[in-house]
Amino acid sequence: MTLDISTLSSWIGKTETMQEQLSPELVGRFNATLGSNFSVEVGELAPLLIHLCLAQPALPADQLGEDGHPRRGGFMPPVPLPRRMWAGGEMTFFGPLPIGAQVKRHSTIRHIVEKQGNSGRLCFVTVQHEISADGTPAVREQQHIVYRGPPVTGGVIPDAAAPPEQGMYVRQIAPSPIMLFRYSALTFNGHRIHYDAPYARDIEGYDGLVVHGPMQATIMAQMAADLHGRPPTGFRYRGRSPLFCDQPFTVNATPSDTSMLLWTARPNGPVAMQAEAFWDN
């Protein structure tokens, strides 16, 4: 399949702006989904990365693709490769997101790059999100999305390298179908690999329902804040291999003075997602 990069590149600079109130009810649903206990009082600080649950596109079903994502060619470029994954991203935090604030997300297509991977052709699309709360800048995010070809025989994604030694701090997570369904609902994410097991296996070639990358990033960012005693000023993460529903995984953290390495992994490897949190001195 040929990628017409010159045509796809015409999407660079395209923008989209959406907004939504950060309600106490949303924080309550966030707590119920991830097992956290953040305050739901108006004016209190909302959990880290809850902005991923806010101001998401809400399109009618007839404007969605087979995979459950918005049909390409609107805000996102019409990349002809069938499978989409959240590859990673970087975030800079300028200020808090208070509960009750009106949150605006201004999104811009920044880069579109074609690469050749071990499993075939890839197309990376970078979207920059500027998040503000009641008009005050709060988060700048670079989101990296990768489009891939059809699954190859024998599995779509080979295992990555074995995980490093266990982190200084370790948390166990047992992802259930309910947890995945609830996080999809929180983020209004229609991607069927998270709740439609036959589709995930038979069409996209996964071993089962896939644990959301953004959910892993959220858990790691909050773990970093809890261990350090305050939220980071920067956070970056990269997906390496998938995690699956009903297969427990670990969240690992090893801190230093001004940063913290984090990763998720299956009990016997491989690493699923790597992250690093930063704090200004």
Q: Which positions does each model-derived feature cover?
A:
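Hydrophobic, proline/glycine-rich low-complexity stretches
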Residues: M1-Q102
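A contiguous, surface-exposed recognition patch within enzymatic or periplasmic domains that forms
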Residues: T2-L45, A160-Q216, M223-D226
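HotDog/MaoC-like acyl-thioester-processing domains
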Residues: T2-T15, W86-P175, P242-D246, T250-N281
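Short, surface-exposed helix-loop/turn micro-motifs enriched in polar/charged residues
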Residues: E44, R121, P231-P232
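Catalytic-pocket segment enriched in acidic/His residues
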Residues: A200-T258, T264-E276
